[in-house]
Protein backbone atom coordinates (compact mmCIF):
# COMPACT_ATOMS: atom_id res chain seq x y z
CA UNK A 1 0.00 0.00 0.00
CA UNK A 2 1.39 3.40 -1.00
CA UNK A 3 1.68 6.21 1.57
CA UNK A 4 -1.04 8.32 -0.06
CA UNK A 5 -3.44 5.35 -0.19
CA UNK A 6 -2.72 4.54 3.48
CA UNK A 7 -3.49 8.10 4.57
CA UNK A 8 -6.73 8.22 2.60
CA UNK A 9 -7.95 4.85 3.89
CA UNK A 10 -7.01 5.73 7.47
CA UNK A 11 -8.89 9.01 7.29
CA UNK A 12 -11.97 7.36 5.83
CA UNK A 13 -11.94 4.50 8.32
CA UNK A 14 -11.44 6.54 11.49
CA UNK A 15 -13.28 9.30 13.27
CA UNK A 16 -10.69 12.02 13.83
CA UNK A 17 -10.36 15.59 15.04
CA UNK A 18 -7.46 18.04 15.35
CA UNK A 19 -8.60 20.88 17.57
CA UNK A 20 -7.48 23.55 20.02
CA UNK A 21 -7.79 22.44 23.63
CA UNK A 22 -10.44 25.04 24.38
CA UNK A 23 -12.41 24.40 21.18
CA UNK A 24 -16.08 23.41 21.17
CA UNK A 25 -15.88 21.36 17.98
CA UNK A 26 -15.60 17.90 19.53
CA UNK A 27 -19.35 17.44 19.75
CA UNK A 28 -19.65 18.24 16.05
CA UNK A 29 -16.91 15.73 15.20
CA UNK A 30 -18.54 13.03 17.33
CA UNK A 31 -21.95 13.73 15.87
CA UNK A 32 -20.57 13.50 12.34
CA UNK A 33 -18.83 10.22 13.15
CA UNK A 34 -21.68 8.73 15.14
CA UNK A 35 -19.21 7.16 17.59
CA UNK A 36 -16.30 8.07 19.89
CA UNK A 37 -13.32 9.53 18.07
CA UNK A 38 -10.49 7.19 17.05
CA UNK A 39 -7.84 9.87 16.48
CA UNK A 40 -7.58 13.13 18.41
CA UNK A 41 -4.92 15.84 18.03
CA UNK A 42 -4.96 18.61 20.62
CA UNK A 43 -2.91 21.73 21.28
CA UNK A 44 -2.94 24.65 23.69
CA UNK A 45 -2.58 23.02 27.14
CA UNK A 46 -0.26 20.74 29.12
CA UNK A 47 0.29 17.18 27.94
CA UNK A 48 -1.71 15.85 30.89
CA UNK A 49 -4.62 18.21 30.33
CA UNK A 50 -4.76 17.36 26.65
CA UNK A 51 -4.63 13.63 27.40
CA UNK A 52 -7.53 13.96 29.86
CA UNK A 53 -9.60 15.69 27.18
CA UNK A 54 -8.50 13.46 24.35
CA UNK A 55 -9.09 10.12 26.07
CA UNK A 56 -12.54 11.30 27.15
CA UNK A 57 -13.42 12.11 23.55
CA UNK A 58 -12.23 8.64 22.53
CA UNK A 59 -14.62 6.96 24.96
CA UNK A 60 -12.45 6.84 28.09
CA UNK A 61 -9.63 4.54 29.10
CA UNK A 62 -12.14 1.76 29.69
CA UNK A 63 -12.41 1.44 25.92
CA UNK A 64 -8.81 0.19 25.86
CA UNK A 65 -8.16 -1.31 29.31
CA UNK A 66 -10.45 -3.94 30.83
CA UNK A 67 -10.71 -5.28 34.35
CA UNK A 68 -7.85 -7.64 35.16
CA UNK A 69 -5.65 -6.57 32.25
CA UNK A 70 -1.88 -6.45 32.53
CA UNK A 71 -0.87 -3.15 30.93
CA UNK A 72 2.56 -2.34 29.49
CA UNK A 73 3.61 1.28 28.91
CA UNK A 74 6.43 2.17 26.52
CA UNK A 75 7.39 5.83 26.89
CA UNK A 76 10.63 7.35 25.61
CA UNK A 77 13.09 7.30 28.53
CA UNK A 78 16.22 7.16 26.41
CA UNK A 79 18.13 10.14 27.75
CA UNK A 80 19.67 11.21 31.06
CA UNK A 81 17.94 14.58 30.91
CA UNK A 82 15.44 16.26 33.24
CA UNK A 83 11.81 16.75 32.15
CA UNK A 84 12.20 20.43 31.23
CA UNK A 85 14.60 19.54 28.39
CA UNK A 86 11.88 17.58 26.56
CA UNK A 87 14.19 14.74 25.50
CA UNK A 88 11.94 12.12 27.08
CA UNK A 89 8.18 11.67 27.39
CA UNK A 90 6.51 14.05 29.87
CA UNK A 91 6.58 12.26 33.25
CA UNK A 92 3.31 13.82 34.41
CA UNK A 93 1.62 12.41 31.32
CA UNK A 94 3.02 8.93 31.94
CA UNK A 95 1.95 9.04 35.59
CA UNK A 96 -1.56 10.07 34.59
CA UNK A 97 -1.79 7.19 32.10
CA UNK A 98 -0.86 4.79 34.91
CA UNK A 99 -3.60 6.26 37.09
CA UNK A 100 -6.20 6.00 34.32
CA UNK A 101 -5.28 2.37 33.64
CA UNK A 102 -5.85 1.41 37.27
CA UNK A 103 -9.12 3.35 37.34
CA UNK A 104 -10.22 1.28 34.33
CA UNK A 105 -9.51 -1.94 36.25
CA UNK A 106 -5.96 -2.89 35.29
CA UNK A 107 -4.39 -5.63 37.41
CA UNK A 108 -0.91 -4.17 36.98
CA UNK A 109 0.84 -1.45 35.00
CA UNK A 110 4.44 -2.10 33.94
CA UNK A 111 6.71 0.48 32.31
CA UNK A 112 10.03 0.05 30.48
CA UNK A 113 12.36 1.40 27.82
CA UNK A 114 15.69 0.21 26.45
CA UNK A 115 17.53 3.43 27.22
CA UNK A 116 20.36 4.95 25.18
CA UNK A 117 22.91 4.06 27.84
CA UNK A 118 23.50 1.22 30.27
CA UNK A 119 22.74 3.36 33.33
CA UNK A 120 19.02 2.78 32.83
CA UNK A 121 18.19 3.19 36.52
CA UNK A 122 19.63 6.72 36.45
CA UNK A 123 17.72 7.61 33.27
CA UNK A 124 14.47 6.24 34.66
CA UNK A 125 15.00 8.47 37.71
CA UNK A 126 16.36 11.62 36.03
CA UNK A 127 13.55 11.67 33.46
CA UNK A 128 11.05 11.89 36.32
CA UNK A 129 9.13 8.95 34.87
CA UNK A 130 10.08 6.38 37.51
CA UNK A 131 8.83 8.61 40.30
CA UNK A 132 5.50 9.34 38.60
CA UNK A 133 4.88 5.72 37.60
CA UNK A 134 5.59 4.39 41.07
CA UNK A 135 3.63 7.17 42.79
CA UNK A 136 0.55 6.03 40.86
CA UNK A 137 1.01 2.33 41.64
CA UNK A 138 2.91 1.22 38.54
CA UNK A 139 6.20 -0.65 38.34
CA UNK A 140 9.36 0.15 36.40
CA UNK A 141 10.98 -2.86 34.71
CA UNK A 142 14.58 -3.23 33.51
CA UNK A 143 14.89 -2.37 29.84
CA UNK A 144 18.57 -2.94 29.08
CA UNK A 145 19.36 -6.38 30.53
CA UNK A 146 19.70 -9.02 27.79
CA UNK A 147 17.92 -11.67 29.85
CA UNK A 148 14.74 -9.60 29.46
CA UNK A 149 14.78 -10.13 25.67
CA UNK A 150 13.83 -13.12 23.51
CA UNK A 151 14.30 -13.89 19.81
CA UNK A 152 11.26 -13.24 17.65
CA UNK A 153 10.59 -13.74 13.96
CA UNK A 154 9.43 -10.78 11.86
CA UNK A 155 7.52 -12.69 9.13
CA UNK A 156 6.67 -9.64 7.01
CA UNK A 157 10.03 -7.94 7.44
CA UNK A 158 12.03 -6.88 4.38
CA UNK A 159 15.25 -5.90 6.11
CA UNK A 160 14.52 -7.03 9.67
CA UNK A 161 13.77 -10.77 9.73
CA UNK A 162 14.45 -11.51 13.42
CA UNK A 163 14.96 -9.41 16.53
CA UNK A 164 15.53 -9.77 20.24
CA UNK A 165 12.33 -8.26 21.65
CA UNK A 166 11.71 -7.21 25.24
CA UNK A 167 9.48 -9.78 26.92
CA UNK A 168 6.98 -7.15 28.06
CA UNK A 169 6.40 -6.12 24.44
CA UNK A 170 5.88 -9.66 23.16
CA UNK A 171 2.19 -10.27 23.85
CA UNK A 172 0.72 -8.08 26.59
CA UNK A 173 -2.99 -7.72 27.28
CA UNK A 174 -2.62 -4.00 26.61
CA UNK A 175 0.37 -2.20 25.09
CA UNK A 176 0.35 1.60 25.25
CA UNK A 177 2.97 3.44 23.21
CA UNK A 178 3.80 6.91 24.64
CA UNK A 179 6.46 8.56 22.45
CA UNK A 180 7.62 12.16 22.50
CA UNK A 181 7.56 13.83 19.08
CA UNK A 182 11.02 15.16 18.19
CA UNK A 183 13.33 15.84 15.27
CA UNK A 184 15.81 13.02 14.57
CA UNK A 185 18.99 13.15 12.53
CA UNK A 186 18.62 9.69 11.00
CA UNK A 187 14.87 9.16 10.76
CA UNK A 188 13.97 12.89 10.35
CA UNK A 189 11.39 12.56 13.15
CA UNK A 190 11.04 10.27 16.13
CA UNK A 191 7.49 9.45 17.09
CA UNK A 192 5.25 6.41 17.45
CA UNK A 193 6.98 3.86 15.21
CA UNK A 194 10.54 4.86 16.04
CA UNK A 195 9.68 4.59 19.75
CA UNK A 196 9.49 0.83 19.14
CA UNK A 197 13.29 0.82 18.95
CA UNK A 198 13.20 0.80 22.75
CA UNK A 199 11.56 -2.64 22.55
CA UNK A 200 14.51 -4.36 20.91
CA UNK A 201 17.99 -5.24 22.16
CA UNK A 202 20.35 -4.57 19.25
CA UNK A 203 19.43 -1.11 18.00
CA UNK A 204 22.81 -0.63 16.32
CA UNK A 205 21.95 -3.34 13.78
CA UNK A 206 19.01 -1.20 12.70
CA UNK A 207 21.26 1.84 12.25
CA UNK A 208 23.57 -0.17 10.00
CA UNK A 209 20.85 -1.88 7.96
CA UNK A 210 18.35 0.68 6.61
CA UNK A 211 16.89 1.98 9.86
CA UNK A 212 13.65 3.38 8.33
CA UNK A 213 12.88 -0.03 6.80
CA UNK A 214 13.69 -1.81 10.08
CA UNK A 215 11.29 0.51 11.90
CA UNK A 216 8.57 -0.27 9.37
CA UNK A 217 9.34 -4.00 9.55
CA UNK A 218 9.05 -4.15 13.32
CA UNK A 219 5.77 -2.23 13.22
CA UNK A 220 4.21 -5.14 11.30
CA UNK A 221 4.40 -7.36 14.37
CA UNK A 222 4.12 -5.11 17.42
CA UNK A 223 0.68 -5.34 19.01
CA UNK A 224 -0.30 -1.83 20.15
CA UNK A 225 -3.60 -0.99 21.82
CA UNK A 226 -3.25 2.78 22.10
CA UNK A 227 -0.70 5.41 21.10
CA UNK A 228 -0.42 8.67 23.05
CA UNK A 229 2.01 11.17 21.49
CA UNK A 230 3.53 13.84 23.73
Task: Give the residues covered by each predicted segment.
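N-terminal and secondary-structure boundary signal
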Residues: 1-230
Amino acid sequence: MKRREFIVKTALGSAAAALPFSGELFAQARQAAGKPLDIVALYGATASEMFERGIAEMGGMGRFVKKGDSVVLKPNIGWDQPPEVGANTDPDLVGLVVKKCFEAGAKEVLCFDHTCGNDWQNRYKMSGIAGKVEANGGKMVAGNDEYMFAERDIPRGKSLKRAQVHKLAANPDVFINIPVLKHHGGAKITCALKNYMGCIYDRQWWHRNDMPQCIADYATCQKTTLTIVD
